[in-house]
């Protein structure tokens, strides 16, 4: 699988896997940004992707930002479809009680390539019965 990346801004950083067995690669901010407590910000990367058909790129939080600072990806995982050609942006939220400063070139999220399966969608009058039925939201245990 090949991921083609175009710089939309010459100062953008091309991502790379940090270890031989890493599942994801880090995305970097193209700008300095301050996220106030409870605030959401859309952070640009200055990059556009050409993703092979049959795959998506999932945008996920960086565990260190979430654990140490309460900064996470709001719509996790965010999905970048293979036919999207615009700038890759990351929607971050600050769950902490303090403003958080993101510096230009700082790692803000990780991206993971995943296969896509499109289902054949069929409208039916009835669904098959199961032991679980319509039970949800904690119905299978305490």
Swiss-Prot record:
InterPro entries, per this entry? dUTPase (IPR008181), dUTPase-like (IPR029054), dUTPase-like_sf (IPR036157), dUTPase_trimeric (IPR033704)
Binding locations of substrate: 62-64, 75, 79-81, 89
Superkingdom of this protein's organism = Bacteria
- Kindly state a single biological-process term from the GO annotations of this entry: dUTP catabolic process
Keywords in alphabetical order, please. Hydrolase, Magnesium, Metal-binding, Nucleotide metabolism
Known pathway: Pyrimidine metabolism; dUMP biosynthesis; dUMP from dCTP (dUTP route): step 2/2
Coiled-coil stretches are none
Q: What is its EC number?
A: 3.6.1.23
Q: Which Pfam families match?
A: dUTPase
Q: Which GO molecular function entries does the Swiss-Prot or TrEMBL record give?
A: dUTP diphosphatase activity; magnesium ion binding
Hydrolase among the record's keywords? Answer: yes
Tell me the cofactors it needs: Mg(2+)
Transmembrane portions of the chain: none
What reaction(s) does this enzyme catalyze? dUTP + H2O = dUMP + diphosphate + H(+)
Which family is annotated? Belongs to the dUTPase family.
Q: What does this protein do?
A: This enzyme is involved in nucleotide metabolism: it produces dUMP, the immediate precursor of thymidine nucleotides and it decreases the intracellular concentration of dUTP so that uracil cannot be incorporated into DNA.
The name of this protein is: Deoxyuridine 5'-triphosphate nucleotidohydrolase
């Amino acid at each position: 699988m090949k991921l083609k990346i175009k710089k939309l801004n010459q100062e953008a950083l091309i991502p790379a896997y940090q270890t031989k067995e890493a599942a994801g690669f880090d995305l970097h901010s193209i700008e300095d940004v301050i996220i106030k407590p409870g605030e959401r910000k859309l952070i640009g990367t200055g990059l556009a992707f050409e993703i092979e058909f049959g795959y998506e790129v999932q945008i996920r939080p960086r565990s260190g930002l979430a654990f140490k600072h309460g900064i996470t990806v709001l719509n996790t995982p965010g999905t970048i479809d293979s036919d999207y050609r615009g700038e890759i942006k990351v929607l971050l939220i600050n769950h902490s009680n303090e403003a958080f400063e993101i510096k230009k070139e700082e790692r803000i999220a990780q991206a993971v390539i995943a296969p896509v399966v499109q289902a054949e969608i069929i409208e039916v009058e009835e669904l098959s019965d199961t032991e679980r039925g319509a039970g949800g939201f904690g119905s299978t245990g305490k």
